[in-house]
Amino acid sequence: MKAIVYRDFGSPDVLRVEDVEKPTPADDEVLVAVHAAGVNMFDWYMVRGKPFVFRLVLGPGRQKPLGVDLSGVVEAVGRNVTRFKPGDEVFGTGRDKMRAKRGSFAEYVSAPEKILAVKPRNVSFEQAAGVPVAGLTALQGLRNHGLLRSGQKVLVNGASGGVGTFAVQIAKAFGANVTGVCSTRNVEMVKGIGADHVIDYTRESFTSGAVRYDVILDIVGNQSWAECRRMLTDSGKYIAAGGPPRRALPLMLREPFTRGKLVTFVARANLADLNVMRQLIEDGRVTPVVDRTYPLEETAEAVRYVAAGHTRGKVVIKVR
């Protein structure tokens, strides 16, 4: 089968399409014929090998797969799999933790049953492929860590990107009053997906306003913690869900001393939350926004586009 692999760390130019062995599902795994695969900033960090821990885990020189999000059709199942059968349409993640043998930028992936769910019936494979990492980051950030409740004020910094477009819609579905931060060209799009207010960051900073927020979900990480803290209500929470890797460690070290106002986290794929996203999508309360699609052969260009940090929704690799 064809798959995207890389051996050295660097720019997207290190990515290659190669013929690799088609996987065989283990007892608890599902073999999926991949139709589409979502591209995430995480993929770019993997290719760069930054933060440095990625280089230690993945190792230099050896063949490495790429890609996390996927949607497709079940081709075969392991003997212990009970929820799926061949022909079922699924979405989820191809990686359980950082197992190097798996990557969703491929024609087939053998993935654990526990991180796959039935694909939402009312969206395309391309739309479904963009949901897992970005959708669960938005969901878990707002619900689990922001403890979002109906009627609260939420600010999403990076509202027009992959995570942000989900966050705006999820916050609205939860009954929040939502402010989105984006550039001029994306203002109308962010309004269109449900934001009550939009701040154009090319004209003003969200940290200079008078409004205080119950939850700030920050996907961009372009403002200091001190500046963001001033924008919170007394019980408000600042959720760091993205930004440059170099920013993560200082925030993590500061987190224990903020009395719960600062939270850093990485989303965890799980069946329950994939099903929450599926229900939100099938109910029409969340619609995955796809910016661009690329064929498998142009994965390097897709990663390059995501790395630039100006996507409008999700970028997806169309495999079939």
Question: What do these predicted regions represent?
Answer:
Residues 45, 60, 68, 83, ...:
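NAD(P)H dinucleotide-binding glycine-rich loop of Rossmann-like/cofactor-binding domains
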Residues 270-320:
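C-terminal hydrophobic helical "lid"/dimerization subdomain
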Residues 128-200:
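Mid-domain Rossmann-like dinucleotide-binding core that forms the NAD(H)/NADP(H) cofactor-binding site
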Residues 21-39, 51-97:
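Glycine-rich beta-strand-centered segment in the early N-terminal region that forms part
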Residues 91, 199, 216-217, 239:
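N-terminal Rossmann-like NAD(P) cofactor-binding module of classical short-chain dehydrogenase/reductase
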Residues 89, 153, 177, 236-237, ...:
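Short glycine-centered segments of the SAM/dcSAM-binding site in methyltransferase folds
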Residues 207-215:
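A short acidic, Gly/Pro-enriched loop at the edge of an enzyme's catalytic core
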Residues 182, 219-286, 319-320:
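Glycine-rich phosphate-binding loop and adjacent beta-alpha segment
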